[in-house]
Design a protein with these regions (language model features):
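RNA-interacting cores
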Residues: 1-179
Length: 179
């Protein structure tokens, strides 16, 4: 998951696997020498830490524990909402609940979707939400923001929805509950 610094630039990437990495994956991470972006200069990554969550001294904030989490990058629903028998199905809120059950094995007590104004204030509209070519983005091009509240604190990282493996749908723990 890419994480931006205070200026909004990605300055590090956290690679996370809930079940850990096998020896071949560790070798692949250790052998990564150069990254290239479209029209940019190469970046030379450095592996800083490798290990279990409980043994690492400093973890990125996204690995924190909280009962409240909120969107850092836009949540893109993996499915399009639809109307079946006069009832709206697969709303962004319903998909977040479903993904929490599937991915986290926890269902939030509440899912508070951000208003379009709040999502815009948080900069969620600045992300590219359409493919350059090929099939359209699942769930439509709308980017959503949300705040999740769980019954008990859970540990991150949390990334849900379309493109979660590329840094979309990332949530951060909320420490200060005075929103």
């Amino acid at each position: 998951m890419p994480e931006a610094d205070a200026r909004g630039f990605i300055d590090h990437v956290t690679v996370y696997a809930p079940g850990g990495f096998d020896p071949a994956a560790v070798r692949a991470l250790q052998s990564l020498r150069e990254l290239h972006g479209l029209g940019s200069h190469p970046t030379y990554p450095t592996l800083v830490a490798l290990g279990r969550r409980d043994r690492l001294e400093r973890l990125p904030a996204l690995f924190g524990r909280s009962d409240t989490w909120e969107t850092v990058t836009p949540f893109i629903p993996p499915r399009c909402p639809k109307i079946r028998r006069g009832e709206l199905r697969d709303t962004p809120e319903q998909q977040i609940r479903w993904l929490c059950r599937e991915v986290l094995r926890e269902e939030p007590l509440t899912v508070e979707m951000f208003s379009p104004e709040e999502a815009r204030r948080r900069g969620l509209h600045r992300y590219r939400n359409a493919r350059r070519r090929g099939a359209p983005v699942p769930g439509g091009a709308a980017a959503h923001g949300a705040r999740l509240r769980f019954a008990a604190p859970i540990a991150g990282p949390i990334a849900l929805g379309y493109g979660a493996h590329f840094g979309l749908g990332v949530f951060r723990p909320v420490i200060d509950k005075n929103f």
